Every structure is written in C-alpha cells, then in structure tokens.
C-alpha cells in the first residue's frame, strides 16, 4: 500500500471511529438481548444462515420477498436459483449484510464480521463495472447497495476491522 493510501485509510478510520463512538453499542446490544429476545434470536438464526451463504429475503421491508431459503455453495451474484430475476436484485442490494454486523455486536464473535468482509470483497472482485451494466449492477440496486455499504464500512472501520 502506498503512503498516500495509508494516509487516506488512516483518515477514514479516524472518522469511522468517531462515528461508532456516537453509539452506545453495549447498551443497544444489551437492550436487544433483554427486551427483544425473540428478535435477537431470529437475527442470529439469519446471520448463521448467511455464514453458510444461505439467503432468505423475508424481512418486513424487503421489496421482493422470497421466504424460500437458497444456499449458494459457490457465490454467484448473477444467477437466480428460482428463475426469478428479482432474486438477483435482492441478493445484490446487500440489505441482509447488516445482520452479520448486528450478530457481531450481539455476540462479539468476529466470524460474523469476517464473513461480512468476505461478502463485500467477493462482490467487488466478481462484479466489474461494465458500460452495458448487468443484473448485479442495476441503478436502483447499486444505490441501495451503496447506502448499505456506507453504514457497514463505517462500522467495520470504526471497530478497527478494515485494513485495506
């Protein structure tokens, strides 16, 4: 990594650390465990599925719900296991990745954030920017993904979990 990139990373990390300091994460995790026990348990179940690359799109605000779980043994961002292109769009929005960050906050288990980073970097490496676009880079889904990534990257960097 060049010196200039190191400086940029250090500046981003510092800002992210200040962002994360604005949250009382210990209180929030404790509150969820104590007062929203069923929701915390469900979140950990969904995060566990994501550890195995199993996807269920059944959250309250999912635009294209799919309650059927699908496991992608090999991560393919452009393939739909059920023949519905809307499934690809849901996969590439990355809303579900917040479950891994929350599971880390609830348990302290860095395996969740390791898998979260794996998803982010795998997506970056397997989805080049093409002039003609692709099913994984539609404009609306790219906007949603960017909003999700912004929050996730702030939390990862703010917790000292990003080094590149």
Descriptions of predicted regions:
Residues 49-59, 71-79, 128-136:
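Short, mixed-charge, low-aromatic patches
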Residues 84-164:
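Aromatic-lined, polymer-binding surfaces characteristic
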Residues 57-91, 101-109:
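Asp/Glu-centered strand-loop micro-motifs enriched in Gly/Pro and often flanked by an aromatic residue
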Residues 1-69:
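Extreme N-terminal leader/anchor segments
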């Amino acid at each position: 990594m060049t010196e200039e990139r190191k400086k940029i990373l250090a500046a981003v990390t510092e800002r992210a650390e200040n962002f994360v300091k604005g949250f009382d994460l210990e209180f929030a995790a404790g509150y969820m465990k104590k007062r929203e026990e069923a929701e915390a348990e469900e979140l950990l179940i969904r995060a566990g599925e994501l550890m195995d690359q199993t996807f269920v799109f059944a959250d309250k605000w999912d635009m294209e719900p799919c309650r059927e779980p699908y496991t992608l043994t090999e991560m393919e961002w452009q393939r739909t296991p059920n023949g519905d292109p809307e499934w690809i769009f849901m996969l590439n929005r990355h809303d579900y990745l917040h479950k891994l960050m929350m599971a880390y906050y609830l348990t302290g288990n860095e395996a969740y954030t390791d898998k979260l980073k794996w998803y982010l970097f795998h997506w970056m490496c397997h989805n080049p920017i093409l002039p003609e676009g692709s099913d994984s880079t539609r404009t609306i889904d790219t906007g949603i993904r960017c909003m999700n990534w912004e929050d996730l990257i702030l939390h990862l960097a703010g917790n000292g979990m990003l080094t590149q």
